[in-house]
Amino acid sequence: AFVTNLCTPMATIIKNQGPISNVLAQIGNYGNFIAYLVMGIPAGMLISKYGYKKTALIGLVVGSVGILIQWISGLMDVDNNLGLVFAVYLIGAFIAGLCMCILNCVVNPMLNLLGGGGNSGNQLIQIGGVFNSTAAVACYILMGALIGDAAKAKISDATPALMIALAIFVVAFIVISFTKIEEPKQAPVQLDLIKGAMSYRHFALGTLGIFVYMGIEVGVPNFVQQYLISDYGLPASTVGMIVAVYWFMMLIGRFVGASIGEKVSSRTMITVVSSATIILVLFGMFAPTITVAFPGVNWGTLEIIWEEIPLGIFSFLLVGLCTSVMWGAIFNMAVEGLGKYTAIASGIFMTMVFGCAVMMFIQATVADLVGYIQSFWCVVACAVYLLFYALIGSKVTRREAE
């Protein structure tokens, strides 16, 4: 989560390296999430061949390489080699994305398995998400402090955050190396099983659900940050604190999701949170132009500063409560009753995370054409689909024998 969420504040830095559009500023997100399209199925094959532990270790090594390449891009001369710097950074983001895909493929089915599937499996996935949200909050606050004045920020300013990310990977590698993990028996991943998995209507619609869900989870904080810095002129340090609230809301939501996950069905969860997302985003878009004071920190003097922000921004931030349970609940519903297709289904599921890159491109294009606030219609459309999936698309019409 810490590494993945570096992409949004890095987009703020990139956007101020020259006359760059919102579409181009999102290259970190493109590289990070397109990697899922490339690695989704191969990651499932790695798990099948090497098991969870070795696959996780492979992913951590790959991630470390990606972080180092991004760090190298910050050492290059931006003024004379802007295109080359972007290319090197994009390669680093892509390689880091390969790592994220591998680790997600390991963690989600493992948690679901340990919980025994069903509501208990969903509960464990939500608990895992708590740790994700904690790291995301830390990432935004740290990057806001490092960026400071966004107009003057360079990729090299993010070096401390990149080194922390590298340290996380190294520590995780050491811990996992000395941890005994019970490996379930893995059936070989056969590509011809893809057609079989996709023949299940609820799974096929669920993969599209993950595709659009990524547009909500990443799109909301991403474009709130770009709006407050580019259009509203707030300092990056304050905006980092503001956007961190979104991820803090996700943290709270995941605590709640973990506590009720065994009692409330995934279908009910998605019905409630997708409806709430639609309402919150629409309010954020059409809220009165009232401003309220929000505290920030001047990291140079360590003084509290107050900035006026639009009331509707708080509505966008509350969407974090909704997205907090979406991933686990969608995954839980989509793989229900797949039997022998579950392994390949996990790989397909991870592949569809590349939807974030697509949705970021679409929303960035809309933002360039009609403005940041109007671009949130993309988020509304994504939430409407998830509501459809919860009410209709997720119904299991047939089950595979276990």
Role assignments for model-derived ranges:
Residues 61-82, 276-305:
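C-terminal ends and interior cores of transmembrane alpha-helices
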